[in-house]
């Protein structure tokens, strides 16, 4: 059955998901603050800043008016970086109160909040009143927007403690090239989605320094061990980390040049300064903020995360990237299961 869906956030992932939902037969309105971006989407059906050369469905409508996008929507999909998530959630909450609507909320945000280190679903549950929403579903997994745009085969996870809501999201998104599995482990799905960006920066740095496949494989594998340890410390199911929102998302993000976190790490490995990398990218590099969050959380929970600690020193204390990588190899020898 066709649903009326509001998609908040018109970056690469938000706009491509909105386009796919439109082609799945749903009535979709895409919201963005940027008037020029909305004009291009509505008249030229393009989004050149984020998806160069991709042409969007003529049935997809964009607007700068969030109330217009949300009015009558049974589903709200939020695809906003963590830094701006609360502001959008509060604006949405006020609109839902005014409209007396209670939609299903789905988010595809990957990261942890600065300072509080909260997961996206925690932020949304605080800022969108229970009377204004149904459950909150997490959509996560190995899914570059560029691949989904060309209808390359993709599989992701819809995670929610209420499996009926996860199954509803599953039906909304699934099609011949985009397969959705369900999971009830929101904590694991969100930690996997956020922390993999840290390891992707490290993987990019490894290659930027000139190391090859063995080094990259070692870093990704040991990085997964770190992600699992921290997630489990917060109550996640360890099995989630060998699924799509865990190892799946990690592999695609830490091995692909489409990953902005990998590209940022690669430039750091080549000797560029962090601020120059950020300026050059022109987009949010979630892994930079997530590194600090994970570093602080690991210290509070006394969880060993040596790769994260090394990258924290590079990103926030100015340590040389090559020195940090060398120190990882010089650590005391230990069991793989520790």
UniProtKB/Swiss-Prot annotation:
<keyword id="KW-0443">Lipid metabolism</keyword>
<dbReference type="GO" id="GO:0005975">
    <property type="term" value="P:carbohydrate metabolic process"/>
</dbReference>
<dbReference type="InterPro" id="IPR013328">
    <property type="entry name" value="6PGD_dom2"/>
</dbReference>
<feature type="binding site">
    <location>
        <position position="33"/>
    </location>
    <ligand>
        <name>NADPH</name>
    </ligand>
</feature>
<feature type="binding site">
    <location>
        <position position="110"/>
    </location>
    <ligand>
        <name>NADPH</name>
    </ligand>
</feature>
<dbReference type="InterPro" id="IPR006168">
    <property type="entry name" value="G3P_DH_NAD-dep"/>
</dbReference>
<feature type="active site" description="Proton acceptor">
    <location>
        <position position="196"/>
    </location>
</feature>
<keyword id="KW-0547">Nucleotide-binding</keyword>
<dbReference type="GO" id="GO:0046167">
    <property type="term" value="P:glycerol-3-phosphate biosynthetic process"/>
</dbReference>
<feature type="binding site">
    <location>
        <position position="143"/>
    </location>
    <ligand>
        <name>sn-glycerol 3-phosphate</name>
    </ligand>
</feature>
<feature type="binding site">
    <location>
        <position position="284"/>
    </location>
    <ligand>
        <name>NADPH</name>
    </ligand>
</feature>
<protein>
    <recommendedName>
        <fullName>Glycerol-3-phosphate dehydrogenase [NAD(P)+]</fullName>
        <ecNumber>1.1.1.94</ecNumber>
    </recommendedName>
</protein>
<dbReference type="GO" id="GO:0006650">
    <property type="term" value="P:glycerophospholipid metabolic process"/>
</dbReference>
<dbReference type="InterPro" id="IPR008927">
    <property type="entry name" value="6-PGluconate_DH-like_C_sf"/>
</dbReference>
<comment type="pathway">
    <text>Membrane lipid metabolism; glycerophospholipid metabolism.</text>
</comment>
<dbReference type="GO" id="GO:0047952">
    <property type="term" value="F:glycerol-3-phosphate dehydrogenase [NAD(P)+] activity"/>
</dbReference>
<dbReference type="Pfam" id="PF07479">
    <property type="entry name" value="NAD_Gly3P_dh_C"/>
</dbReference>
<feature type="binding site">
    <location>
        <position position="196"/>
    </location>
    <ligand>
        <name>sn-glycerol 3-phosphate</name>
    </ligand>
</feature>
<keyword id="KW-0520">NAD</keyword>
<feature type="binding site">
    <location>
        <position position="249"/>
    </location>
    <ligand>
        <name>sn-glycerol 3-phosphate</name>
    </ligand>
</feature>
<keyword id="KW-0521">NADP</keyword>
<dbReference type="GO" id="GO:0005829">
    <property type="term" value="C:cytosol"/>
</dbReference>
<dbReference type="InterPro" id="IPR006109">
    <property type="entry name" value="G3P_DH_NAD-dep_C"/>
</dbReference>
<feature type="binding site">
    <location>
        <position position="12"/>
    </location>
    <ligand>
        <name>NADPH</name>
    </ligand>
</feature>
<feature type="binding site">
    <location>
        <position position="145"/>
    </location>
    <ligand>
        <name>NADPH</name>
    </ligand>
</feature>
<dbReference type="GO" id="GO:0051287">
    <property type="term" value="F:NAD binding"/>
</dbReference>
<comment type="similarity">
    <text>Belongs to the NAD-dependent glycerol-3-phosphate dehydrogenase family.</text>
</comment>
<keyword id="KW-0560">Oxidoreductase</keyword>
<dbReference type="GO" id="GO:0008654">
    <property type="term" value="P:phospholipid biosynthetic process"/>
</dbReference>
<keyword id="KW-0444">Lipid biosynthesis</keyword>
<dbReference type="InterPro" id="IPR036291">
    <property type="entry name" value="NAD(P)-bd_dom_sf"/>
</dbReference>
<comment type="function">
    <text>Catalyzes the reduction of the glycolytic intermediate dihydroxyacetone phosphate (DHAP) to sn-glycerol 3-phosphate (G3P), the key precursor for phospholipid synthesis.</text>
</comment>
<feature type="binding site">
    <location>
        <position position="110"/>
    </location>
    <ligand>
        <name>sn-glycerol 3-phosphate</name>
    </ligand>
</feature>
<dbReference type="GO" id="GO:0046168">
    <property type="term" value="P:glycerol-3-phosphate catabolic process"/>
</dbReference>
<feature type="binding site">
    <location>
        <position position="141"/>
    </location>
    <ligand>
        <name>sn-glycerol 3-phosphate</name>
    </ligand>
</feature>
<feature type="binding site">
    <location>
        <position position="260"/>
    </location>
    <ligand>
        <name>NADPH</name>
    </ligand>
</feature>
<feature type="binding site">
    <location>
        <position position="13"/>
    </location>
    <ligand>
        <name>NADPH</name>
    </ligand>
</feature>
<feature type="binding site">
    <location>
        <position position="260"/>
    </location>
    <ligand>
        <name>sn-glycerol 3-phosphate</name>
    </ligand>
</feature>
<feature type="binding site">
    <location>
        <position position="261"/>
    </location>
    <ligand>
        <name>sn-glycerol 3-phosphate</name>
    </ligand>
</feature>
<feature type="binding site">
    <location>
        <position position="259"/>
    </location>
    <ligand>
        <name>sn-glycerol 3-phosphate</name>
    </ligand>
</feature>
<keyword id="KW-0963">Cytoplasm</keyword>
<dbReference type="InterPro" id="IPR011128">
    <property type="entry name" value="G3P_DH_NAD-dep_N"/>
</dbReference>
